[in-house]
Structure formats: structure tokens, C-alpha cells
Amino acid sequence: MTVPDIRKDFMIVNMGPHHPSMHGVLRLIVTLDGEDVIDCEPVLGYLHRGMEKIAENRTIIQYLPYVTRWDYLATMFTEAITVNAPEQLGNIQVPKRASYIRVIMLELSRIASHLLWLGPFMADIGAQTPFFYIFRERELLYDLFEAATGMRMMHNYFRIGGVAADLPHGWIDKCLDFCDYSLTGVVEYQKLITRNPIFLERVEGVGIIGGEEAINWGLSGPMLRASGIQWDLRKIDHYECYDEFDWEVQWQKEGDSLARYLVRISEMAESIKIIQQVLEGIPGGPYENLEVRRFDKARDSEWNDFEYRFISKKPSPTFELSKQELYVRVEAPKGELGIFLIGDNSVFPWRWKIRPPGFINLQILPQLVKRMKLADIMTILGSIDIIMGEVDR
């Protein structure tokens, strides 16, 4: 009598590279034993455009339109880091009004990013209603961006030494109205989602990351703060003028998908609180450092000709990056967004290294999904909040 062979073969499934809920093209090669995940291998690079190499062949001003294509849902942060690096390299002072305007734009961009994380994340786990609700606040936000910068997305608003244009007449009142309205929206989301038993069943205890583990993996942003680590670069690095306002670092200690949701939803309310304080105390004065508007160093340069009489509206085409190196970082919605810049007494950076939060946060995904169910992959991946534009660069 022959004994039947009861050996099981694992099933290998491709998720992607196009998944309907993904911002970009990520491919997951998942090994399954029935419904249980045995292994998961992310395949990156489908959206690689050589952003670091492009930077080495452009001046900072020429490169600014490119950076909004990294994380295209939080473009103000990529612009901020791009101008902060040469500002610190050249020791350029930013006027107080410009710094206040920057904080407003950064926090509005943080809210926009979290809103467009919340909708697809809820759709991933089966709740379609919030996906449509978030577009109300998002449309109002984009109207504010359009009025101030001329663009709904890809704003190209930050400049070395300030911002491109002052806030238009009546914009501050509109922004205050938006803050009052969106606070009620955040409360509505919390009522709709946070205590929903089906939602809690899907996210509670799923994808747990301990505090020490989060530090060892190099996680940042809500991924780190949801694991009990109170680390926010706005408090740590004291950049722009965040120290002048009263706000708290939002954190949770559970480290699961629910904790990451709670951190982001409370960060939206905290950002509104910061914006309200900035709008009430915004000072007068210039919106950019006029000393940055330099002409070409060469005598009788073509840049000084009659045809170029308006060139002083822009930072000089010969804005040199001194021969030194530095690392600059900001607290983006997804985590620590950093630039390692090496100058070479040239108008082009010698090296422009991008440290995207999404790329590093994504590395923990295979560990989180092991021994989980197949359906939990989208919950965990959604709670990480990645944009493939900045992951692949």
C-alpha cells in the first residue's frame, strides 16, 4: 500500500506592479501557504527617474520644479528641503514673514497628505465612504494653494531666501475659515472611523512594531511615533519658526496599524492648531531675502543687459554652492526627508543625496506581513503610507 504524498506546495502570487490603491507602481512577490503569508519581497524601481543625477546637472533654481515630483502629495516639503540646503550652506537668512508663510504652507501640505492617505487607506480595508469625504477638505486646501502659488499641485513656491510671492489679499481670512471648517471635519472622521467595530477588527494588533525595533530599522515620522518614540524634527531641529508656537508631538505606544492611524488623524488637528497661531501672529516685512538677488559676478555680463533687466526677480544664475558638505532634514508627513549636499564652488551640486522617508519605512514591510493573512497585507502597506515617486526617485 502506497502512502499518499501530503506535501504542500506554497503558492507564489504577484501583487502589482499596478494595484488600484497604490500611489505608484510597487510589485510584491508574496509566498502563500493557503491564506497565510510565508514571505513577501517588494520589487522597487518602476518609477525610477534618476532624480539625484538630474540634480548634479542643474542649478538649484532649475532643479526646483523637479523636486515636486518626488512625493507629489506633499510637494511643499520637497521644495523646503531643496532651498534649506543651499540656505544653510551659504548662511542665508530668511525674513520672518517668509518663515511664517513657509510654516503655513508646510502644515497645509501635511494636512493634504494625511487626507489623501486616509481616504485610500480606508478604501483598502473596505470603507468607501471616507474616501469621498476627504475630497471636500482637500478641494478647499487646493483652492488655497492655487490662490497663493498659482498651482493646485507641484507648487514651485519656495525660493532660496524666502518664497516666490506674498500671500494675496484676503487669503489669510480664507485660510482661517478653512481651519475652522476642517477641525469639524477631523472630528467627523474620528466619529465615523475610530470606534467602528469593523475598522478596529481590521487594524487593531495588525503590523505591530516595537519602539526599539522601529529605531533599529531607521523608521521615522508617524511610523516611529506610533511605536512610543516622541521624535519630531520640528521640535528636535528647531527649523523655521516652530518654536514660537504652542503645539504637542502626537504619539501612541501600541505600534500597530491603529496607532499609526491615530497619530496621523491627531496630527491633522495639531497642524490646524499651528496654522491658526501663525495666521494670528504673522508679521509684516519682505517675503524674500533681497540680498540673494545677485547679478553675475563677471563684469559687463550679458545678464546685466537691457533684455535681462528683470533677472533680479530671481536668485542669480550664478548662485555658487561653497565647497563644503552638510545634511539637512525636515519632518515631512511620512517621516524624515533629508538631503546630503556636497558643494564644489560651482553652480551645480557635486553630490545631491536624497533620504526619502517612504523608501526606508517600506523596508520593514516583509517582516510585518510574515505569518499574517493575505488580506492584512493591504492594511499594513496602507498604514506605512508610501508614495512610489519618492521611494524610487
Swiss-Prot record:
PROSITE patterns: COMPLEX1_49K. Its EC number is 7.1.1.-. It catalyses: a plastoquinone + NADH + (n+1) H(+)(in) = a plastoquinol + NAD(+) + n H(+)(out); a plastoquinone + NADPH + (n+1) H(+)(in) = a plastoquinol + NADP(+) + n H(+)(out). It is found in: Plastid, Chloroplast thylakoid membrane. One of its GO terms (biological process) is photosynthesis, light reaction. It is a peripheral membrane protein. This is NAD(P)H-quinone oxidoreductase subunit H, chloroplastic. The lineage of its organism: Eukaryota, Viridiplantae, Streptophyta, Embryophyta, Tracheophyta.
